[in-house]
Amino acid sequence: MITVENKWLDLLGKCILTLYLYLISYFYTLSYPWSWSAPLRLIGFGILVHVACEALKKIRITIRSEASKWSWRFGAAVFGISMILLGVYYVAFYPGGIIIDSFNQWYQVQTGVYVDWHPVVHTLLFMKLPSLICNSLAFVNFVQMLWISLAIMYLGMVMKHWGIRRKYVIIALLLALTVPASGMVLSFCWKDTALTIFVIVLAAQMIEIICSDGEWLCKWSHVLELASASVMAMLMRHNGILLVGPMLFFLVLFFWKKAKKFCIGTVLLFMVLVVGIKGPFYRLIHVQSHSQVSA
């Protein structure tokens, strides 16, 4: 039985998805978002979203009331599939793509002079650390491929953990990684790819929280995991707060009664980590600020 509250949430979700698809469409067509075609596009996307959502509602996927044991064998399979699919693009674009943003960061790695024009945390984690093992852009891109595959492995295991059938997980994985745009973009070592990795981790953690009705969050070790992933996602892009901020807001809003102190702890730890990294840590490694930043 669908309650009035759920109907409003359903409508809100459809409106948000419609607006998202409408705005995204202009990134591909490079046309002006407020052109004469705007009403037609909105109506078209609205109909598409409504039909798709109603069709998906008819699919019954059983979610366990309690999580099952972790299936590491299945996780290894997901990891292997991800590595193979991404590996095809890695070989095709060897030694990996690089754009002007990444080239600037790679130059900072070689000189040891860091400027917060692009997120320094991304420069350090995804370029500097791998370069200490092998100072090669090809190796840096390979390590990034490993991180992507591990993140997808974690998400797949969480979905299986809560009763999603293996075939649905594999289908979702194949749909995500066989799209050429995904494979090509993930072949570039840049901040958008790094953000994607941590968004995948956050998505898995949100599944844990929602499916457990907040119980997953009621452990301080999980608070640390969620806060850390949120910090990393935010620091991969200068506008990362636009993603993490609303996520934490809704986390507190929906789970305040069931996990009040853990919600507060997550937000406070998140703030402390951000201040600590962008304050004392940046000063320690002499990060130079910039009057303008690239989001």
Predicted regions mapped to residue ranges:
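Extracytoplasmic catalytic/substrate-binding loops of multi-pass membrane glycan-assembly enzymes
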Residues: 93-105, 113-126, 134-138
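Aromatic- and kink-enriched transmembrane "portal" helix at the membrane-lumen/periplasm boundary
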Residues: 27-35, 91, 120, 134-137, ...
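Transmembrane-helix signature of polytopic, membrane-embedded enzymes
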Residues: 10, 155-180, 197
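Transmembrane-helix motifs of polytopic, lipid-linked glycan transferases
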Residues: 47, 142-163, 201
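Specific aromatic-rich, kink-prone transmembrane helix
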Residues: 110, 154, 196-214, 230, ...
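Membrane-interface alpha helices of multi-pass inner-membrane proteins
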Residues: 222-237, 248, 270-274
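Juxtamembrane membrane-water interface segments immediately following transmembrane helices
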Residues: 242, 263-295
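Start-transfer (signal-anchor) and selected internal transmembrane alpha helices
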Residues: 1-24, 31-86
